Amino acid sequence: MAHYFVGDVQGCFAELQRLLAKVDFNPSCDELWAVGDLVARGPDSLATLRYFQSLGDAGKTVLGNHDLHLLALHGKLKRDKPSDNLTPLLNAPDIASLIDWLRQQPLMRELPEHKIIMTHAGVPPQWSLEVLRQESQLVSQALKQSDYLDALISQMYSDTAERWEPSAIGINRLRFCINALTRMRYLYVDGHLDFDCKQPPEDCTNPQLRPWFEFTSALRQSHTLVFGHWAALMGKVNDPKLKALDTGCCWGEYLTLWHLEKDQKITQKRLKKG
């Protein structure tokens, strides 16, 4: 069995298929792990979601911020933007099935035999593996409830839940987990989240900010962390135990696939329109 990890697909389905053809991906014996943000901006979010749903146990994804936003759009909590290219997906006859499938996906996944953890944006350095499991599970439980739109999705948008408070309860606790696992890039030196700076570290001019992965973390020492979200990094992190896989395909760059067993990255340039 081969394990392949793919960066933010964001509707770039043709590029994904090219990548999988390059490695002869076979869902009957291989697994495809996705760092989230399967949808938005690229030309074919519908085909992308249908494909991952069809993979069954051979496909493992986590939720990204755009995937959660899709839940809000489907629930009429947010307005669809033409630039997101999500109208065909939202109007699809099987949208209810796809949304139900998406709601079952977690915020983190583990591959214990290889000591790998996958999330969309990263893991707060304050968190142990036990805390990561616990907090992500709380969000997953909320997403699976029948009132998930009112109880979670309608309240998840907030920049105020930027600091980890172990004593927090209810929506504030869930908000921090969502913010950290799906939106995080930089932290202030005291450890609270910044939501504004998206530049690569070499271009960040705020001396109070550091990338989340530059903070001391026991989890980073014991595990390989696989993540996406931060396209400006273009996969460049100076640590073999960090796998940054978002390389900006939906922005005209390329899609990256990491073959775990060979520790090899394979890329596919964004295809030209038409």
From Swiss-Prot:
One GO term of the biological process aspect: RNA decapping
Keyword Hydrolase: yes
Pfam families: Metallophos
GO cellular component: cytoplasm
GO molecular function, one term: bis(5'-nucleosyl)-tetraphosphatase (symmetrical) activity
SUPFAM superfamilies, alphabetized: Metallo-dependent phosphatases (SSF56300)
Enzyme Commission identifier(s): 3.6.1.41
Keyword S-adenosyl-L-methionine recorded: no
Keywords: Hydrolase
Reaction it catalyzes: P(1),P(4)-bis(5'-adenosyl) tetraphosphate + H2O = 2 ADP + 2 H(+)
PANTHER family the record matches: BIS(5'-NUCLEOSYL)-TETRAPHOSPHATASE [SYMMETRICAL], METALLOPHOSPHOESTERASE
Biological role: Hydrolyzes diadenosine 5',5'''-P1,P4-tetraphosphate to yield ADP.
Classification via HAMAP family: ApaH
Family, per entry: Belongs to the Ap4A hydrolase family.
Name of the protein this chain belongs to: Bis(5'-nucleosyl)-tetraphosphatase, symmetrical
Gene (name only): apaH
